[in-house]
C-alpha cells in the first residue's frame, strides 16, 4: 500500500474511533456549492462530511474492529463523522435532503456502538432531539403546576369576592 493511502487509512481509523458515530451516505448530483453548504451545516453540530473511497473506508472499519456491511454501497460514498450527538448529525442530513431534492441516500450508520441500516438511521433522524424531548418533559411537568396555580388563584379570588360582598352588606 502506498504511503499516502496508509496515511489516509490511519486518518480514517482515527476519525472512526474519535467519533460518537458515523453515517454512510450515497450522494447524487452533489455540486461543490452543495458540499460546502452541507459541511457548514454539519459543523454546527460537531460533525464533518468526507468523501472516501469505499476500499479505504471499509479497511479502516475492519482495522478499527467495526463490523458493517451496507446493503448497497454503489455510487459515490460520503461519510458523516459525528463528534457530538450523532442523532443531531442525522437530523442535519435529513434537513439538507429535504432542501436539496433527496440528493443524499442513507446507506448505513453507527450510533452508540450499534450498527444501523440506512432506514434505521433515517428513522432515528426523524425522532425528536434530546433538547425537544427535554422541552416536552418540562411542558408535561409544568402544565399540571400551572393548572394548580390557576385553581388556587380562582379559589383565592372567590374568597376575596365573598369577603368583599360580606363587607358591603355589613356597611349597608
From Swiss-Prot:
The gene is rplJ. GO terms for cellular component: large ribosomal subunit. The keyword Ribonucleoprotein applies. Forms part of the ribosomal stalk, playing a central role in the interaction of the ribosome with GTP-bound translation factors. The keyword Zinc does not apply. Pfam families: Ribosomal_L10. Belongs to the universal ribosomal protein uL10 family. Keywords: Ribonucleoprotein, Ribosomal protein, RNA-binding, rRNA-binding. GO terms for molecular function: large ribosomal subunit rRNA binding; structural constituent of ribosome. This is Large ribosomal subunit protein uL10. InterPro entries: Ribosomal_uL10 (IPR001790), Ribosomal_uL10-like_sf (IPR043141), Ribosomal_uL10_bac (IPR022973), Ribosomal_uL10_bac_type (IPR047865), Ribosomal_uL10_CS_bac (IPR002363). Part of the ribosomal stalk of the 50S ribosomal subunit. The N-terminus interacts with L11 and the large rRNA to form the base of the stalk. The C-terminus forms an elongated spine to which L12 dimers bind in a sequential fashion forming a multimeric L10(L12)X complex. GO terms for biological process: translation.
Amino acid at each position: 500500500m502506498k504511503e499516502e493511502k496508509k496515511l489516509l487509512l490511519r486518518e480514517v481509523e482515527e476519525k472512526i474511533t474519535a467519533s460518537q458515530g458515523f453515517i454512510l451516505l450515497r450522494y447524487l448530483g452533489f455540486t461543490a456549492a452543495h458540499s460546502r453548504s452541507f459541511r457548514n451545516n454539519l459543523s454546527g453540530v460537531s460533525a464533518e462530511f468526507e468523501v472516501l473511497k469505499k476500499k479505504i473506508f471499509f479497511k479502516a472499519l475492519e482495522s478499527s474492529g467495526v463490523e458493517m456491511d451496507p446493503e448497497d454501497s454503489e455510487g459515490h460514498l460520503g461519510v458523516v463523522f459525528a463528534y457530538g450527538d450523532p442523532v443531531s448529525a442525522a437530523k442535519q442530513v435529513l434537513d439538507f435532503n429535504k432542501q436539496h431534492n433527496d440528493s443524499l441516500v442513507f446507506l448505513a450508520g453507527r450510533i452508540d456502538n450499534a450498527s444501523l441500516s440506512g432506514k434505521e438511521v433515517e428513522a432515528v433522524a426523524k425522532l425528536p432531539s434530546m433538547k425537544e424531548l427535554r422541552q416536552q418533559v418540562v411542558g408535561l411537568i409544568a402544565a399540571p403546576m400551572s393548572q394548580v396555580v390557576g385553581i388556587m388563584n380562582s379559589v383565592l379570588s372567590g374568597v376575596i369576592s365573598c369577603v368583599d360582598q360580606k363587607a358591603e352588606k355589613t356597611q349597608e
